[in-house]
A protein has these predicted regions:
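Structural helix-adjacent loops and short alpha-helical linkers that scaffold large soluble proteins
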Residues: 4-29, 86-98
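A general structural-boundary detector
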Residues: 11, 15, 63-66, 84, ...
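Beta-propeller domains
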Residues: 20, 24-46
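Short, structured motif recognition centered on aromatic/hydrophobic residues
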Residues: 32-35, 77-83, 101-104
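CBM-like carbohydrate-recognition segments
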Residues: 41, 45, 55, 102-171
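Intrinsic, low-complexity N-terminal interaction/targeting segments
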Residues: 45-70
Length: 171
């Protein structure tokens, strides 16, 4: 329950000075506000979060050559787990959580299986759901990258080295 969570936190961090607790709480609140600001939008409204952002513009940005500006599905799912653990989410956070969960439901891939040894996507009745590691901003299409910096819409166009060395699909 919420009361138990708060009581545990109060006991667990009782050694922390009250002033520092207040500063940490304010920093945490600013972090949540930033998460809300960074959540991307598509034609349906709020969607997911990008993997990385430009430090000044806060727009989705490139990281490594095969990590393009895109929605980061696996990382967004982890972020949802965190947000769902908060004891008293605000109305804005609840809207954010529902929007991201709805995005995941709308874009689940079924009847496809990511073969872990062959590193290929195969048709398989009843398989899934699974999601791509990255989804294109605005279109939500699965996208993939390679060391050449090119963007691909078919994971099989990615070199075997990158298919073996990167998690392109997640369950």
């Amino acid at each position: 329950s919420t009361a138990e969570t708060e009581s545990t936190a109060e006991t667990e961090f009782a050694f922390v000075d009250a002033s520092l607790q207040q500063q940490a709480g304010q920093a945490f609140s600013r972090g949540l506000k930033l998460l809300l600001q960074l959540q991307q939008r598509d034609e349906a409204g709020l969607s997911l979060w990008a993997a990385q952002y430009h430090h000044r513009t806060l727009q989705p940005a490139w990281a490594r050559a095969y990590e393009m500006p895109a929605l980061a599905v696996m990382e967004s799912a982890s972020l949802l787990d965190f947000l769902l653990s908060l004891p008293k989410p605000s109305v804005e956070l609840l809207q954010s959580i529902h929007a991201a969960a709805n995005w995941l439901a709308r874009h689940a891939i079924t009847d496809q299986h990511w073969h872990p040894q062959l590193r290929v996507l195969q048709a398989k009745a009843g398989a899934g759901p699974l999601w791509p590691r990255f989804a294109e901003l605005n279109t939500n299409r699965p996208i993939f990258g390679d060391r050449d910096g090119e963007l691909y819409y078919d994971v099989h166009q990615v070199s075997l080295e990158r298919r073996q060395g990167y998690a392109w699909y997640t369950e």
